[in-house]
Amino acid sequence: MLHTTPSGLLIIDKPQGVTSFDAVAAVRGALHIKKVGHAGTLDPMATGTLVIAFGHATRLLNAIVAHDKTYEATIRLGLRTTTDDAEGEVLVDDEARSRWQTLSAQLTEGGQSGEPTALPTASWQDLLTRTIATNFTGDIEQVPNTFSAIKINGQRAYDLAREGKEVELKPRPVTISEFTVLNIRSGFVAGEQAAEPLREDANTGAIPALDVDVRVSCSSGTYIRALARDLGNELGVGGYLTRLRRTRVGRFALPDDASGLIAPEAMLDTRTHTVTAHTDQKTFTNREGQTVTRNKCVLDTPEGLAGDERRNWLLDHALTMEQAARGAMPALDITPEEASELRFGRRIERTISEPTAAIVPQTHDVAAIIERANAHQAKPVTVFPLA
């Protein structure tokens, strides 16, 4: 059956264990649409908000990528890893352990150097609050993680790092509007696996550690792994990320977003449009004739739906082109006549100060993205066909 190509956004709650591209592939396959993309990569270990555009809405992605974001994460203090997250190898640092004992003596009564000590969470709460307020809020400079997708002379930083080559990344300005400590758990780890859970008992050789649950709202381009690393370095005890969930991208939020940064009047209906997904496995034979098993992303739809029925269900849960445009950037209501002018590449008599979606509200027609031409006129920079 032939389909007209629809346009819109799907808000996917990405599961752990798959890449953002895996989620895009799942949407592409389910909707039978080639033109699909996402607004901001989530690492395989991360979960949460992945804004996926299809059809003409892919031309809104550049605007959405630039939006600020909210994350909920767990930072483990007391150790370091090679990747600054739980997917790397644990680095046991004698200097960091010595610093932990110094903090233990300072924050507890009778803390003795050389003994593994789990610090009271109340003492940590005050120390963390002061450290974060002083060093990790507002406008800061952040050095991205070595294992990141940033390109250096055409090569990804993580590829260079895996090859054992030295990677030097320059600090970047980012803005942290919120960095809140939500919960603290104190305990011990063996230090053999980065993802191992905390335990209460201190066996021989146990390493004291602290798991800190945080919520971070930040500008685009902020690395939460780098925040975990830098917080641990500032305290002198080491730190890395063990959990990461993105709850909000601009005005696109998951039902569990608790940032409170989206005003009720600006709230999009993304909470009822979110599509969950889960991780499964697929097995295939590669070009070398080898049998390969890897993870894949599977969109959660009602049981029994397949083909066109499953496609239509997903489209019903997608944001329309108009909703997508209004969520992606400022919007301006225009007349049908102005829409026609814009589609011919002509200017309209409107005063704007930033890139804006020009929409005919009566017909929900997104005509163009416009920008300031002069003090009294706006010009089209991206034109959309009449749906």
Curated annotation (Swiss-Prot):
UniProt keywords, alphabetically:
Isomerase, tRNA processing
Q: List the InterPro entries hit by this protein, alphabetically.
A: PsdUridine_synth_cat_dom_sf, PsdUridine_synth_N, PUA_sf, tRNA_psdUridine_synth_fam2_C, tRNA_psdUridine_synth_TruB, TruB_C
Q: Where is the active site?
A: D43 (nucleophile)
EC nos: 5.4.99.25
Q: Which GO terms describe its biological process?
A: mRNA pseudouridine synthesis; tRNA pseudouridine synthesis
Q: Which family does it belong to?
A: Belongs to the pseudouridine synthase TruB family. Type 1 subfamily.
Function comment = Responsible for synthesis of pseudouridine from uracil-55 in the psi GC loop of transfer RNAs.
The protein's annotated catalytic reaction(s) are: uridine(55) in tRNA = pseudouridine(55) in tRNA
- Source organism (scientific name): Bifidobacterium longum subsp. infantis (strain ATCC 15697 / DSM 20088 / JCM 1222 / NCTC 11817 / S12)
Q: Which cysteines are joined by disulfide bonds?
A: none
Superkingdom of the source? Bacteria
GO molecular function (one): tRNA pseudouridine(55) synthase activity
Question: Which Pfam families does the entry mention?
Answer: TruB_C, TruB_C_2, TruB_N
- Please report the name of this protein according to its UniProt entry: tRNA pseudouridine synthase B
